[in-house]
Amino acid sequence: LNKEDLLKMIPDADRIKDSLEKNLKKNKLSATSKNGMVTAVINYQQEITDLVIDNRLLDPTKAGALKASLVEALNQAIKSSRNKMLEETARAIKLI
């Protein structure tokens, strides 16, 4: 069986899938670097929707700190988003 066959076997699978995707795109969370200078906002589909950078990090001499803060905030946001995506998927599956 492939994915399409499985979806045909589940009543309202398309409706459930569409609802899940809508919720994953709509719901957002944020993560901030330890130094508090970068905040990443991400939806549950793991798409970055906003990035807030403290102006002090835009100084060219702070490029290393900016990079480290971006990586930290983005990785934390992705990790949190992944967990929320799994929770939402589990919730949708229980509706079947």
What are these regions (language model features)?
Residues 29-52:
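Short edge beta-strands and adjacent turn/loop segments
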